[in-house]
């Protein structure tokens, strides 16, 4: 429009106002790179309410510029004036759609399928295998629970709430804990002292036929020094029983 000078210009209604006219699309860019090649044609693609525009570039690898954006239906008052520099007239055209496109940075324009792409059949197989494994695990756990419930009703076993196993505890006797492997010295001393007393009584009973021996043995009391109260009581009672039995035998 740099060639437009001051003055009056004619405005002619365009073919877009007729019923059988071609449609007009208005595009608004966020910016247009300087490397766009205006000498070559681009490609415009439409998918539902979105547009994708490919414009050629001046790059050595011939990588195009990609623009993507949404579109909306134009209103009845949305129009555009097209200026003809030769005839010095404007043509008024009605706009059908308005698109706002944004340039993509480092767009992926490769036509090859990526190596990590998964097809629909692969997805279906994966989903079927997952569902099969899940159903198998669910079936096994359900059968196990049903068997445990049936066995518990028959009185055989009780259903277990977990898989944890604990060692069996015997109820035949009290539970003891060995804190020390060494024997009780006090018990051993009492046992040894009892054996000595029994041995002394046996010697006295064996020599009962000799009156002199009996009198000597009976007249000699057993020393209770260095003994505990329990040992003294045990020795005194044993000595008294031995003397009484010896006197009865003499009678």
Swiss-Prot record:
GO BP term, pick one: transcription elongation by RNA polymerase II
Compartments, record wording: Nucleus
Oligomeric form and interacting partners: Forms a stable heterodimer with ell1. Ell1-eaf1 complex interacts with RNA polymerase II.
Comp. bias regions, Low complexity: 124-135
GO CC terms in record: super elongation complex; transcription elongation factor complex
Pfam families: EAF
Residues annotated with Phosphoserine modification: 247
Gene that this sequence comes from: eaf1
Organism annotation: Schizosaccharomyces pombe (strain 972 / ATCC 24843)
Residue ranges, annotated region (Disordered): 110-187, 201-251
GO molecular function: transcription elongation factor activity
Domain of life assignment: Eukaryota
Keywords associated with the record: Activator, Nucleus, Phosphoprotein, Transcription, Transcription regulation
Record's function text: Activates transcription elongation by RNA polymerase II and pyrophosphorolysis as a complex with ell1. Acts as a transcriptional transactivator of ell1 elongation activities.
Family: Belongs to the EAF family.
Keyword Transcription appears in the UniProt entry: yes
Comp. bias regions, Basic and acidic residues: 143-157
Bias type Polar residues, positions: 112-123, 204-220, 236-251
Keyword Metal-binding in annotation: no
Protein name, per record: Ell1-associated factor 1
Upper classification of the organism: Eukaryota, Fungi, Dikarya, Ascomycota, Taphrinomycotina
């Amino acid at each position: 429009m740099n060639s437009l000078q001051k003055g009056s210009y004619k405005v002619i209604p365009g073919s877009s106002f007729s019923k059988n006219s071609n449609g007009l699309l208005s595009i608004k860019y966020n910016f247009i790179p300087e490397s766009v090649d205006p000498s070559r044609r681009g490609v415009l693609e439409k998918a539902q309410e979105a547009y994708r525009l490919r414009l050629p570039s001046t790059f050595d690898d011939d990588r195009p510029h990609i623009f993507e954006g949404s579109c909306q239906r134009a209103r009845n008052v949305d129009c555009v004036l097209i200026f003809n520099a030769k005839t010095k007239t404007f043509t008024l055209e009605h706009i059908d759609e308005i698109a706002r496109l944004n340039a993509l940075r480092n767009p992926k324009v490769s036509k090859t399928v990526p190596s990590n792409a998964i097809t629909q059949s692969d997805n279906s197989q994966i989903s079927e295998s997952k569902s099969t494994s899940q159903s198998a695990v669910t079936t096994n756990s359900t059968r196990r629970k049903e068997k445990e419930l049936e066995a518990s009703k028959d009185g055989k076993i009780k259903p277990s709430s977990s898989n944890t196993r604990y060692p069996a505890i015997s109820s035949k006797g009290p539970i003891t804990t060995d804190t020390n492997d060494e024997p009780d010295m006090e018990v051993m001393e009492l046992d040894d002292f009892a054996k000595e007393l029994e041995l002394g009584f046996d010697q006295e009973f064996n020599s009962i036929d000799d009156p002199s021996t009996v009198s000597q043995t009976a007249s000699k009391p057993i020393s209770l020094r260095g003994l505990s109260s329990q040992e003294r009581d045990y020795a005194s009672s044993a000595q008294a029983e031995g003397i009484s039995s010896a006197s009865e035998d003499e009678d």
